[in-house]
């Protein structure tokens, strides 16, 4: 899918935002005012390979910049579905994509691309987009939970993302469900995203409803016990996070929640009925993301613009020569 949002002057200043999920890879150019100039969507497997994922990623970015005439970005900002070091330089673990674990990805990409490079968890970019788009104040506490191939979690406190000691905070998808033994891609067993995220739905469709497209599972079989259990399991980590943080806002999103027939009202009722009373349960404010696939690109771009403004990234004057 290629979309030209508007005509633009090639002399204007822009950054490249990239959103890499377990399923889809999205890239786009965003000007300094936050306007999306162009975007392109592809499948993530095209940059995922055990031996040469970095080469594939660099080549993909370079090809996009040449083909769409964006050879001179101020920066490139990428959201990975990964656990990332606190200094946002290294990918610790990327369970749903091969070839990215343990890489000092920022230094590699900066050298290969020749421009400042920023990275963060993909869900941090999604939440940043929501905060900017909704005009939520810096003083507010906001948690975001986005359910796609896995379960992404972002925590924003006092205007900054909560990263934890090592940068691994917010791994809500690896919250353990008692008594569950299925092996997760992370190497542990019983992780909630193994039971209540997109990859589990793929398994349910394949094993239980082989004649049904995955996007029609809830529409056709939402009252089946296996899917009712899926929804209940998904509410458990959401309730836990609300009870722990007592946030001003909870933002829920991702492809699973926007599936046709997903029982959203029941899901929200499960959450509200199990949060601690009287607070945070009585007045927790739950907002739903609009699930626009461009949000991750824009959030990545906002992160780059913020980083360039505050000097988070070491500035490099050398422009990309490709």
Question: Can you say where each PLM-predicted feature lies in the sequence?
Answer:
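A charged helix-plus-loop insertion that forms the helical arch/lid used to bind
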Residues: 89-102
């Amino acid at each position: 899918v290629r979309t030209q949002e508007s005509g633009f002057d090639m002399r204007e200043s822009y950054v490249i935002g990239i959103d890499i999920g377990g399923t889809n890879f999205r890239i786009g150019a965003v000007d300094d005012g936050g306007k999306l100039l162009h975007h392109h969507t592809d499948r993530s497997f095209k940059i995922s390979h055990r031996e040469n994922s970095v080469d594939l990623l660099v080549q993909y970015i370079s090809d996009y910049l040449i083909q769409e005439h964006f050879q001179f970005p101020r920066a490139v900002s990428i959201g990975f579905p990964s656990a990332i070091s606190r200094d946002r330089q290294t990918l610790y673990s990327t369970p749903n994509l091969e070839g990215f674990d343990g890489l000092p990805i920022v230094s590699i990409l900066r050298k290969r691309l020749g421009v400042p490079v920023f990275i963060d968890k993909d869900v941090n970019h999604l939440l940043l987009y929501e905060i900017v788009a909704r005009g939520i104040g810096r003083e507010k506490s906001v948690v975001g939970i986005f359910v796609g191939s896995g379960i992404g979690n972002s925590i924003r406190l006092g205007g900054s993302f909560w990263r934890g000691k090592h940068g691994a905070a917010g791994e809500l998808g690896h919250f353990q469900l008692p008594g569950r033994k299925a092996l997760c891609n992370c190497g542990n067993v019983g992780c909630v995203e193994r039971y209540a995220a997109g990859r589990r739905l793929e398994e349910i469709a394949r094993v239980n409803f082989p004649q049904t497209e995955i996007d029609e599972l809830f529409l056709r079989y939402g009252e089946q016990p296996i899917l009712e259990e899926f929804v209940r399991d998904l509410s458990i980590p959401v309730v836990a996070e609300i009870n722990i943080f007592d946030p001003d806002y909870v933002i829920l999103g991702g492809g699973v929640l926007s599936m046709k027939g997903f029982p959203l009202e029941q899901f929200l009722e499960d959450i509200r009925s199990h949060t601690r009373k009287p607070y945070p349960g009585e007045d927790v404010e739950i907002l739903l993301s609009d699930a626009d696939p461009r949000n991750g690109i824009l959030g990545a771009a906002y992160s780059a613009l913020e980083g360039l403004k505050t000097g988070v990234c070491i500035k490099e004057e050398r422009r990309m020569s490709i």
